[in-house]
């Protein structure tokens, strides 16, 4: 469950390390985001000479949550961290590599992220 002020790891090579959720997109008073939801983030930590700078406001898709994902068969997939992948305005990933596992729930809307990820659960 991701809400405003949640700090997330960045799971791509865009250059950002940590981002903070500043808005959950997809509704006027939407409070929480889950895996596959798009959020507005502010870059809090970035490596030098990278594609994104500290303080930049961007869109991101949530790829891992500590709360986990409940599947239709009743299984639950949980992760150790909350992570997101940065997106441009066309909802395409900025980075060219995805680090760590991602879930199959991203398949409908973010096939590019699934193809870049090394491990899909």
From Swiss-Prot:
Cysteines paired by S-S bonds: none
Record's keyword terms, sorted: Ribonucleoprotein, Ribosomal protein, RNA-binding, rRNA-binding
Record GO biological process: translation
Coiled-coil residue windows: none
One GO cellular component term: cytosolic large ribosomal subunit
Cross-referenced CDD domains: Ribosomal_uL14
Domain of life where this protein originates: Bacteria
Transmembrane segments: none
An annotated Gene Ontology molecular function: structural constituent of ribosome
NCBIfam families given in the database record: rplN_bact
Family: Belongs to the universal ribosomal protein uL14 family.
Function: Binds to 23S rRNA. Forms part of two intersubunit bridges in the 70S ribosome.
Assembly and oligomerization: Part of the 50S ribosomal subunit. Forms a cluster with proteins L3 and L19. In the 70S ribosome, L14 and L19 interact and together make contacts with the 16S rRNA in bridges B5 and B8.
Record's protein name: Large ribosomal subunit protein uL14
Annotated source species: Legionella pneumophila subsp. pneumophila (strain Philadelphia 1 / ATCC 33152 / DSM 7513)
Record lineage: Bacteria, Pseudomonadati, Pseudomonadota, Gammaproteobacteria, Legionellales
């Amino acid at each position: 469950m991701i809400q405003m002020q949640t700090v997330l790891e960045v799971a791509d090579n865009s250059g950002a390390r940590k981002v903070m959720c500043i808005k959950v997109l997809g509704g006027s008073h939407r409070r929480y985001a889950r895996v596959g939801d798009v959020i507005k983030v502010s870059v809090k930590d970035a490596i030098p000479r990278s594609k994104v700078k500290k303080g930049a406001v961007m869109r991101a898709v949530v790829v891992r949550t500590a709360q986990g994902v409940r599947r239709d068969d009743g299984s639950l997939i949980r992760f150790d961290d909350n992570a997101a992948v940065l997106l441009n305005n066309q909802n395409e990933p900025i980075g060219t590599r995805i680090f760590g596992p991602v879930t199959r729930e991203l398949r409908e809307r973010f096939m590019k992220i699934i193809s870049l990820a090394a491990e899909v659960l």
